[in-house]
Amino acid sequence: RGCRLGISFPEIYEMQCRAIFEALAQLKKKKIKSAFVEIMIPLVSTEAEIKIMKDLVVNIANEVQKQHKLKIEYMVGTMIELPRAAIKAKEIAKHAEFFSFGTNDLTQTTFGISRDDSGKFLNDYLDNKIFSIDPFVSIDDGVADLVDIAVEKGKSQNKKLKLGICGEHGGDPKSIEFCSK
């Protein structure tokens, strides 16, 4: 799953990246100036993982650019969806132009619970005030702390680091309020 697949079977990611960059090259040849892509490396937990995967992406992009004799615009970033990635964000940001916070997985891995089986106990946790909110609906304060840590550490390494969020929290007003800070 995630970048592990690309490290264990790089030919899969090479094929996917080549297809993306070939499509981008075709758009550039058609003079579509807005043609741009962001490649997001998923489930990164170490600097080495993103470095290996970014090198793969850059190599394929260079091959396609050379083959088509044109420059293509792209960025490489990662999804921050593991607590370790948030804690090691400074090192990861050395090789990322953006972070997208995968708050669904970050919530699951922070609590050690699965959305698939949380329905069996979540109401009990809410009734007993173990959780004040459903952490899969609104960002929990512990998950928010991990996001804050990752933003601070990532931006300390790369001032231009672009930030985003993906997942269901992106549609929740309380979570949006947190992200706007």
Give residue ranges: language-model regions.
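Conserved alpha/beta-domain cores
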Residues: 1-181
